[in-house]
Design a protein with these regions (language model features):
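Sec-dependent N-terminal signal peptides
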Residues: 4-13
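Carbohydrate-interacting/catalytic domains
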Residues: 16-66, 72, 105, 110-111, ...
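Substrate-binding/active-site clefts of carbohydrate-active enzymes
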Residues: 20-48, 52-63, 69-183, 203-217, ...
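Structural recognition of the beta-strand scaffold that forms the well-ordered cores
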Residues: 33-35, 64-69, 119-120, 189, ...
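Active-site-proximal helices and loops of the catalytic beta/alpha 8
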Residues: 108, 175, 186, 191-275, ...
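Active-site clefts of carbohydrate-active enzymes
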Residues: 268-290, 810-830
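Beta-strand/beta-sandwich contexts
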Residues: 401-433, 486, 490-495, 499
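Immunoglobulin-like IPT/TIG beta-sandwich domains and homologous Ig-like subdomains
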Residues: 418-480
């Protein structure tokens, strides 16, 4: 199985980049079908649980989901506890075991949204003995014996056979199938189809297709020639299946295989479903490992590459399912993950989708080979694939083509209607010496190619005309007599994508470190293609949190008042240790498999949007990980900053705008490495800069993102980064980007915000910056409760806010009480609940965009402060409600920030604060129709609110406490020690 880990590059190249369903009928020629056993697919065994797995199937490469029978199961003659799926009691309902019709509709809608089709398992031959038709319809609707009892077939004691000699049966069956077509299904897999007359299938299939208004797919569980004549698109390859079992067991060989292959060649478009397992084989004959042993991969290759074949994956095969599913009972669900079996099937799907030569209708040429091997070539549309399979141990196999030299093409796909120019990075052995062009691609053409320092790269400029249509184009490469092509997909851009809105001062941003949040899928904690394994007890190890965990908490976050999520990087970080944080990226276009997949991330964004939560991606342009794939073969010598030995950045931001700076100091600031495991990228290289521009746009379009947070912003080359920001905003004018500028020097921080009148003329084009000075002021001010001198206590907050004169856009500052790099606010404030609530009160009401670190709302503290980052980045305490102090903090936070959602004065109102040197802070936020008053008492004693001091505000109004909703007279108001009050006019 080790060889499967070597397939990752091929998968990355060939994997589908579908952004939306295609409207044209693909003819099913390259479709991958997945048989979904709802009962056993998930621990819950429901449509809802299965729906959650659809993004994984899409990422796997599945095109068509075949749902095993989902109808109510008869009770009369029932086998086992739950019964056989194929003993149907009602054709127009769902089995309550699986869920409701509405649950099924949701499943179909989600599959269609992902670009997959759904077909139903249809059992037209028989019903259960207690189907209503048995007693409510004429007796002749069923075959009956001389005593009037319904007839069974084989050992199927739980069924009653229908009589298609009755017109009523035909009409009722057609009407039942219409019911499901109207609900959006895309076709039917017809059980035991040959037992139902041809003269039923022929008009029924034709009628359903005519009425559907879209292509419908019909698959027959049969192998009679008349199936195609009746209108079926494909039929089972039962004979072939039993043959490959025999070959694997040594009782048959090449001669029998060639004879069977000839029937595939002669099929002339009549497709055959090929499989190594299905529900019958798994439960009754055994798993593919039982039947085929070590030959299972080789036999799979035949299923996926022969002419006129359609490949099937049965539930659990992609997880290495090693047991026979119980047929009449609930069984253990497969252990989903990203192991070598998933990699194998992902590779097969990628080959099938990436090569027209592997379409069902592609040409076939058998080659000479030894007695224990079959070799053949498949050809279509200029594409050519060589397949070789050994028919005896050691069962070697290969799928090869000239295109195998291509390891990567990035971006992996693109969109119509974009402003950002497209330049493809093509990585492959010696590809720099090849020519590139698009053939027969109206509106899409190559305008230039550029060699790199390494011969294994080619940069290809692509022009996409305004009228270019979405679709899969072929990028052709040629060198002398040699040529090959690869697919490149151009997607239709979402309507309104360019006008997307972003995060603002009206939002509450919730910072999640995914590995330390919630583990929603323990099966992906480790992966065959990543190095570091999970170690939940290690401070700096991987704990297992993932995308599924974030998704599971969206309802909690919405209820909390969260309107935006910033998660620390989810992209692949395959360094040897401390990879949990994600800041040492090793692949810019793929989500780390221990978090999930690209499709799961996109689904998370969709789900978040349904909860009215925006999604902000944390991106790193300054450095990559030392195990990034390009580190073994850099495109250009100056792709990264190379030093004679490890040279750390001097971390001195002032070198970027110091009028007296020495050049060596400025260069070291920009070019020194951030860490020994994080090589510093050189954005002065124009190809790298263009790479990062496209990469950012790609993720915005692909995942439908709402914003970026840029890590270590001033460490980048500042002029290229200014250009990078400008290019993103040219594509998305209302998009927001916040940069990390970690300094307590207000003018130094202000220098990096777009529009700031810098004396050197520099404009970063960076819309938002993180307000580290204010965060420091929060911690220093609220942790001091002693006698107040000139610069102690809450005057620090006053002074910091007074420095807003330096900021070009004070409302577009990200303000926070802490983040993943700093001590938690409860730690900073001595675990004092009143002080933490005061911090949240200031966070909710001061200017800017509030951000809170995950779990701070439940009064989380570091596990071990001596462990630094590893100690503060605790796992989210899912049982927080059992802790009264955590629940009290949560309830306060929830009330505060849900109130903030609807408060225009806090979002955009004028700010007026009042200077006092008694360790209190008073502030008004003033909008046209409302005012908000905030008073924070940081003393260890009660304080009277000096309401008369605020007369200039015009305080004659009725005021209400925003937490309790009660009316308050602020002229006679005292605020308890280490507490606050927030009032609002109505």
């Amino acid at each position: 199985m080790k060889r499967l880990t070597l397939l990752a590059a091929a998968i990355a190249l060939l994997a589908s980049c579908t952004g939306s369903p295609k409207t044209e009928d693909a003819g099913w020629n390259n479709s991958v079908i997945y048989e979904l056993n709802t009962r056993q697919f998930t621990p819950e065994g429901t449509f809802k649980a299965a729906e959650d797995q659809l993004p994984r199937l899409k990422e796997q490469g599945v095109d068509v989901v075949w749902m095993m029978p989902l109808y109510p199961i008869g009770e009369k003659g029932r086998k086992g506890t739950l019964g056989s799926y194929y003993a149907i009691k009602d054709y127009c309902a769902t089995n309550p075991e699986f869920g409701t019709l509405e649950d099924f509709d949701s499943f179909v809608a989600k599959a269609h949204q992902l670009g997959m089709k759904v077909i139903l398992d249809w059992v037209a031959n028989h019903t259960s003995p207690d189907h209503a038709w048995v007693t409510e319809k004429p007796a002749e609707w069923y075959y009956r014996d001389e005593n009037g009892n319904t007839v069974i077939e084989y050992d199927w004691t739980d069924i009653a056979k229908l009589n298609y000699g009755c017109e009523g049966v035909r009409e009722a069956m057609l009407e039942a199938m219409r019911f499901w077509v109207a609900r959006g299904v895309d076709g039917f897999r017809c059980d035991m189809a040959s037992l139902v007359p041809e003269d039923f299938w022929t008009p029924t299939i034709a009628t359903l297709r005519e009425e559907a208004g879209k292509p419908l797919f019909f698959l027959a569980e049969a192998e009679e020639d008349w199936m195609h004549r009746a209108g079926f698109d494909a039929m089972y390859a039962w004979r072939f299946h039993h043959l490959i079992n025999d070959i694997a067991q040594g009782s048959k060989g090449k001669a029998e295989l060639l004879e069977e292959v000839q029937t595939f060649v002669d099929a002339q478009g009549r497709k055959r479903l090929c499989f190594t397992s299905n529900h019958d084989e798994n439960s009754w004959a055994g798993t593919e490992f039982e039947r085929m042993g070590e030959a299972w991969q080789a036999m799979s290759i035949l299923c996926w590459t022969l002419p006129n074949s359609l490949p099937l994956i049965y539930t659990g095969q992609e997880a290495g399912l090693s047991w026979r599913f119980k047929f009449f009972e609930k069984d253990e669900a497969p252990h989903w993950g990203n192991g070598e079996y998933a990699e194998f099937y992902r590779y097969l799907c990628a080959q099938r989708h990436g090569h027209p030569a592997l379409d069902a209708d592609a040409g076939f040429e058998l080659l000479e080979s030894g007695d224990d091997e079959i070799r053949f070539i498949r050809r279509k549309a200029g594409d050519e694939v060589l397949v070789s399979v050994q028919l005896k141990a050691p069962w070697k196999w290969s799928i090869s083509s000239e295109a195998d030299r291509i390891e990567r093409v990035e971006p992996m796909c693109w969109w119509t209607g974009m402003k950002t120019p497209l330049q493809l990075l093509v990585k492959g052995e010696g590809i720099g010496e090849w020519n590139a062009c698009f053939k027969d691609a109206k509106g899409v053409r190559v305008t230039g190619t550029h060699k790199a320092d390494s011969p294994n790269y080619l940069f290809v400029d692509v022009e996409i005309a305004a009228g270019a249509q979405p679709g899969t184009y072929r990028l052709h490469f040629s060198k002398g007599e040699k040529s090959f092509s690869i697919p490149y997909e151009l997607l239709e851009r979402r309507e309104g994508s360019a006008e997307r809105k972003s995060f603002s001062s009206a939002d509450l941003m919730y910072l999640i470190m995914p590995d330390r949040f919630v583990n929603g899928n323990p099966y992906n904690d480790n992966s065959a293609v990543t190095t570091e394994k999970a170690d939940p007890k290690a401070f700096f190890g991987r704990h297992g949190g993932d995308i599924a965990g974030i998704s599971s908490q969206l309802g909690y976050l919405e209820d909390l008042g969260v309107t935006a999520i910033w998660n620390t990087p989810l992209l692949e970080d395959n360094v040897d240790k401390e990879s949990y944080h994600g800041y040492a990226c090793t692949d810019y276009y793929h989500i780390d498999s221990r978090f999930g997949s690209n499709e799961e991330y996109r689904e998370l964004v969709r789900d978040a949007h349904e909860h009215d939560i925006k999604m902000i991606m944390d991106i790193v342009t300054n450095h990559c990980g030392n195990r990034h794939w390009w580190m073994e073969d850099l495109p250009f010598k100056d792709w990264i900053h190379v030093w004679p030995e490890y040279t750390h950045s001097n971390c001195c931001f002032s070198a970027q705008n110091d009028p007296y700076v020495a050049e060596i100091d400025r260069y070291n600031m920009e070019s020194g490495w951030f860490d020994t495991s994080m090589p510093d990228m050189n954005l002065d290289n124009p190809y790298l800069l263009q790479y990062f521009k496209q990469w950012a746009v790609w993720w915005i379009e692909w995942a439908d993102l709402d914003g970026f947070r840029v890590d270590t912003y001033p460490y980048n080359e500042k002029y290229p980064m200014s250009e990078w920001c400008a290019s993103i905003l040219e594509e998305y004018p209302d998009f927001n980007i916040v940069g990390e500028v970690w300094s307590n020097n207000v003018p130094q921080v202000a220098y990096w915000q777009a529009g700031n009148p810098n004396r050197d003329g520099f404009n970063s084009n960076l819309p938002a910056i993180m307000d580290f000075p204010l965060q420091t002021a929060f911690c220093q001010a609220l942790s001091y409760h002693g006698k107040v001198n000139w610069d102690e206590g809450l005057v620090k907050v006053y002074d910091c806010v007074a420095n807003d004169q330096y900021y070009h856009d004070k409302d577009n500052m990200l303000i926070f009480t802490g983040n993943h790099d700093q001590e938690r606010i409860a730690d900073c404030l001595g675990k004092d609940a009143g002080s933490v609530k005061n911090a949240f009160a200031l966070l909710a009401t001061l200017r800017g965009i509030p951000q809170v670190l995950y779990a701070d709302e439940v009064f989380a503290v570091s596990k071990d402060r001596s462990q630094g980052h590893g100690g503060l980045r605790v796992d989210f305490p899912l049982e927080w409600e059992k802790d009264p102090q955590a629940k009290d903090m949560h309830d306060y936070f929830k009330a505060l920030f849900n109130w903030r959602k609807g408060c225009e004065a806090v979002h955009n109102g004028e700010l007026k604060h009042f200077l006092r040197r008694d360790n209190t802070y008073a502030m008004f936020r003033i909008a046209e129709k409302e005012k908000v008053f905030v008073f924070v008492n940081n003393n260890e004693a009660e304080v009277q609110v000096p309401w008369a001091d605020y007369s200039e505000i015009g305080t004659d109004a009725q005021w209400f406490d925003v937490i309790t909703g009660q009316a308050v007279d602020p002229a006679h108001l005292s605020v308890a020690a280490k507490s606050n009050i927030i009032l609002q006019t109505r």
